Amino acid sequence: MLYPLIKQALFQLDPERAHELTFQQLKRITGTPLEWLVRQSVPTKTVNCMGIAFKNPLGLAAGLDKDGDCIDALGAMGFGFIEVGTVTPRAQPGNEKPRLFRLVKAGGLINRMGFNNHGVDNLVENVRKSHFGGVLGINIGKNKDTPVEQGKDDYLTCMEKVYPYAGYIAVNISSPNTPGLRTLQFGEALDDLLLAIKNKQVALQAYHHKYVPVAVKIAPDMTEAELIQVADSLVRHNIDGVIATNTTTGRVLVQGMNHCGQTGGLSGRPLQLRSTEVIRQLSAELQGKLPIIGGGGIDSLIAAREKMAAGASLIQIYSGFIFHGPRLIKDIVSDI
């Protein structure tokens, strides 16, 4: 593939500008015969998870295709599943630029995007037009100007709109870039949110005559006691899966590197150890009661295997995909 040459050119640009240019091109070919330009053949390695058959265990994490603009082109690269979003009820611009930074030596990224997206109605239109043959996850969040105390209303609004079109729904309560959002991961706030989400799921199942599983995406920056509490809440409320993990606010492994002091969530290789440890702890606590979708620092076959050995049933890539391109998909799926 030409990705090493393309990457060399893109990495000369501001990270967000490089992302915009790449997606402009992918948007032009998505859903057209020109998808052959990015298509690659990967073996089928079916995994049954959350009651769904995934054609292979490797997915694209949320955050790359926030509005579902390029689902078909990304799908042509061989992902078993794609998670679009995070999407909010209303369009919002996100945080001020610059808000995305490369830590090239570390194979990492720091972002403080802030759920920039064109709103849930726009996403649904894009999803309706797509023809992706894999599983489509839709990641939902709350608007920045919605008070945290009313945050569950945003999740329920998004759930209602995406439910007919989602393979599964991911509930993002762990981004560090929306003020107060991570407080929804704990105690009564978490129980209140999960109860409302489960009740909504039951109502939507009755209305649409189909069951769409719900997974909750958690942060890596929790103590073991906090993780145990989260796991207990997920099981008690019959949530279908957990996505571990989101980005970290920690900087231990990137001290002294360019951009390490930027505010935001760190992803990529520096997150691999911590996210894998969270998965291991969750797996020990959950004892198979619900599946784990593992992400955070997967940039090689070995990193992918480490996640699965720790207890993940499915895995997702984001930063590794940016640093290594579509070839990483084939390398992982072929030998996982």
UniProtKB/Swiss-Prot annotation:
Main location as per UniProt: membrane
Pathway it works in: Pyrimidine metabolism; UMP biosynthesis via de novo pathway; orotate from (S)-dihydroorotate (quinone route): step 1/1
UniProt-recorded name of the protein: Dihydroorotate dehydrogenase (quinone)
Annotated substrate binding sites: K66, N111, R112, M113, G114, F115, N172, N177, N246, T247
GO CC, any one term: cytoplasm
Cofactor: FMN
Catalytically driven reaction(s): (S)-dihydroorotate + a quinone = orotate + a quinol
SUPFAM superfamilies: FMN-linked oxidoreductases
Database matches in NCBIfam families: PRK05286.1-1, PRK05286.1-2, PRK05286.1-4, PRK05286.2-5, pyrD_sub2
Subunit structure, interactors included: Monomer.
Classification lineage: Bacteria, Pseudomonadati, Pseudomonadota, Gammaproteobacteria, Enterobacterales
Annotated gene: pyrD
Coiled-coil residue windows: none
Keyword terms of this UniProt record: Cell membrane, Flavoprotein, FMN, Membrane, Oxidoreductase, Pyrimidine biosynthesis
Intracellular or extracellular location(s): Cell membrane
Summary of the function given for this chain in its UniProt record: Catalyzes the conversion of dihydroorotate to orotate with quinone as electron acceptor.
Family affiliation: Belongs to the dihydroorotate dehydrogenase family. Type 2 subfamily.
Domain of life (superkingdom): Bacteria
Residues the record lists as binding FMN: A62, G63, L64, D65, K66, T86, N139, N172, K217, T245, G268, G297, Y318, S319
